[in-house]
Amino acid sequence: HKEYRRQRQMCIRDRLGVSDTAFASQGLAVHSPIDGGLIATVRETSPAEADAVITQAHAAFMEWRTVPAPRRGEFVRLLGEELRLHKETLGKLVTLEAGKILSEGLGEVQEMIDICDYAVGLSRQLFGLTIATERPNHRMMETWHPLGVCGVISAFNFPVAVWSWNAALALVCGNSVVWKPSEKTPLTALATLAIAERAAKRFGGIPKGLLSVLMGTHSIGAKLVENENVPLVSATGSTAMGRQVAPKLAARFARAILELGGNNAAIIAPSADTALALRAVAFAAIGTAGQRCTTLRRLIVHESLYEPFLTQLRKVYQSVRIGDPRLSDVLVGPLIDAQALTQMDKALAAARALGATITGGGRVTCEGLNGAYAAPALVEMPRQDGPALTETFAPILYVMRYHSLDEAIALQNGVGAGLSSSLFTLDMREAERFLAVDGSDCGIANINIGPSGAEIGGAFGGEKETGGGREAGSDAWKAYMRRATNTINYGTSLPLAQGVSFDLPTD
């Protein structure tokens, strides 16, 4: 086992450039969910070191903000190039550390590349506005300036992509970035920063501390939340985590981008292309072993289609291969750890107590792999209640019938989270109704595509207990900048707005 671990560490060091100083005999023990084996032990950041890192990041910001935005974009372009060069190696590490199937591990790195490409173009489009003014010989405009140190707290399920969504935009906007990754996936974070160092060398150097990482548990993440030199924190995690983070940021008037829980639904209407819907439902419900924030967790099927559609879906659930995510024919890998498997068991027991009929859902033994493997569960509920109302981070799909579209939309909106949603229909009126003000209440509403698989061109995030944050998309850059309104008087008089008169007495 020691030799196996040594070889893995050598791969991370030699192929991705992670320094030996990142590892330690005592610290964060990193286990692969694939086989439960210890990959490495990572040195933790002390509270004092965390404070010093943030101080250094603030100094880096003070320098970086004066670099022209297109030049900042050039660094991000080089970062994207380095990610392309190391896509396969980093993608395999995502699979090893997070348990995703290999195509999803590679796809996550592609997301990083995509957001870098997007941010490069954005670096020449940080537009302000010139605004009509009522005062003669005046000009009024809005300008945008870098904000400061941007903190990023990410979760295990997208161990590198979430950082890139924030970092690529924050960098072109003139900010520094301090990253606190999940304690379950620190190696991918270290590898990402090592790749960024390669880009920095090609760029000609960047300010020390412009990109940095904090290793540890929630107490180290709290340093980002509490530090006055961090004006923005993007936090991805559970709604419970958001309830802890948001008040602390609000208390010091810091900005928050909260990407929290999702209890996403899809509606299958009578006119749906059922072959397309079946594939979309399967991908959204069982991909990443149900551990996406956009995982499909509730399926609302019209009563006329319920039996034939569920018959086909049961066959899919019974045939999908579960096992080592590094194998090309495996579609469902492990849950992140045994605790996740326990939570899945509890949710299924609660559904069964309500009278649900369950297909799948049992624990799966994979030869030679000591991971937390489970069969995806198809749970036919008598009503939307109990565990169907909350998010369980596991491959559980609760299925319900509906009679009218109004009823289906009410079911879809009848939960605390409001991240992603979808409707499968060929009826234009139904589609437009779903997207209208009285349709889906989610931040993402799709037609004939599931709730998962967002692209960086669209704003990502949700409403209600999902937190209200947005990342990527057309105007996400504004979150990483501060806006100033400027009025210039180039005349010789001082006209006041709104016709106010304030004439000083004359001698």
Model-identified regions with their sequence ranges:
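Residue-level signal for inorganic ion chemistry
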Residues: 36, 72, 94, 116, ...
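Active-site and channel-lining beta-strand-loop segments
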Residues: 20-45, 463
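Single conserved hydrophobic/aromatic residue that forms the stacking wall/gate
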Residues: 1-8
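Conserved C-terminal structural/oligomerization subdomain of aldehyde/semialdehyde dehydrogenase
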Residues: 35-41, 205, 230, 267, ...
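ALDH superfamily catalytic-core signature
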Residues: 198, 240-383, 405, 410, ...
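Glycine-rich loop-to-alpha-helix module at the N-terminal edge of alpha/beta enzyme cores
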Residues: 39-127, 137
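Short, basic/aromatic recognition patches
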Residues: 9-23
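Rossmann-like NAD(P) dinucleotide-binding subdomain of oxidoreductase/dehydrogenase enzymes
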Residues: 128-276, 402
